Amino acid sequence: MDMISLKSPREIECMRRAGRLTAQARALAGSMVRPGVTTHEMGTAVRRFIESHGAKPSFLGYGGFPGSACISVNDVVIHGIPGPLKLKEGDIVSVDVGAFLDGFHGDCAATFACGQVSDEAMHLIHVTEQSFWEGIKLARSGNRVYDISHAVQQYVEANGCSVVRDFVGHGVGAKLHEPPEVPNFGPAGHGPRLQPGMTIAVEPMVCAGDWRVKVLRDGWTTVSADGSLTAHYENTILITDGEPEVLTRVED
């Protein structure tokens, strides 16, 4: 089994730069969410932005993925392939972005409202994002990975939604996906112990209905099995001696 990598101060600084660029790309894509824009246009803008800063889109070609970002609309939870789909009023749009810079990856996601959306959709977006913040309250040295997982699940389910079981968060570093896995469900007190220098992507994937999902025939697009709305929120974080540090953030 691969070891969990603990990052050196130099590596952490590289990950801050990669994370900042990734967060900026997420914000750029989010700013484009409006009726009439295609997911292809959003993906192209992400690629141009990342490449203009001397970096590479982490997802492009990863496992054969054809896009530079995952743009997932409504019942698509994750891995939506950018294409001709035009956004319309009332859609909710998840943007998942990765950037590879100076030998390290950043990985982050958020779900955006397209114009006026339903109360159910706004509730789902809020619950998904807030569950991330609830989870990382437990992302402290000495705690265990599943302490985060349990906190995410508890918050989501207390608010009438469900967490996807088939896909999970993960370590991030020189590779886009590293150990450990970081589920959004499970019993507290289990999993690897968190240590300073660990860098992990915590990414609640949440359904308004049942948690079960299915992958479409393209091999990527993953939708809620019951057709319910879905949302996704993710940041790459650093475990420290104190509070966790969010690496995928746009500097103030």
How would you label these PLM feature ranges?
Residues M1-D252:
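Active-site neighborhoods and metal-handling regions in enzymes and metal-associated proteins
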